[in-house]
Amino acid sequence: MIIYLHGFDSTSPGNHEKVLQLQFIDDDVRFINYSTLHPKHDMQHLLKEVSKVIDQANDPNPLICGVGLGAYWSERIGFLCGIKQVMFNPNLHPEKTMAGRIDRPEEYEDIATKCVRQFRTKNQERCLVILSKEDEIHDNSKTAAELDKHYQIIWDETQAHKFKKISHHLQAMKAFKNA
């Protein structure tokens, strides 16, 4: 089973396209929607929903993935639920990048302070990161510098921030999921 979390643009038709692409490596792809506007509520909702679908699935190696803000949540929720994660162009600091877009971006900072200390060290090797060199939203060299001591990073040469085509990375995802 693969759980897919959308980014900030939850209504993008690209979300459906990504789910269809993910079905090439796993028939059971679950799309979990969340508000993007209320971080504390989103975290509670995502923890509950992800735990529920993990319990329902008959998969010894479930995987959670997302793009941008969805990648942020994939890493945290995946860690808390004990499943592997794949992040595409993660928004690592939504407390800064979401300022002006949502009412309470400081809630992300509060979430970070309440998260397990050094969770990336404890999550070592449980997350695969795919970064685009053409990300127009984030400087992924900074993202790589923050994550490369914990996770394997794959660079993509062509995709923009929303990562429309994940198909080039499906085999790496499948190998990571089943390893």
UniProtKB/Swiss-Prot annotation:
Pfam families to which the protein is assigned, alphabetical: UPF0227 (PF05728)
HAMAP family tied to this protein: UPF0227 (MF_01047)
Family: Belongs to the UPF0227 family.
PANTHER family: ESTERASE YQIA-RELATED (PTHR35602), UPF0227 PROTEIN YCFP (PTHR35602:SF2)
Protein name, entry field: UPF0227 protein VIBHAR_01524
Species annotation: Vibrio campbellii (strain ATCC BAA-1116)
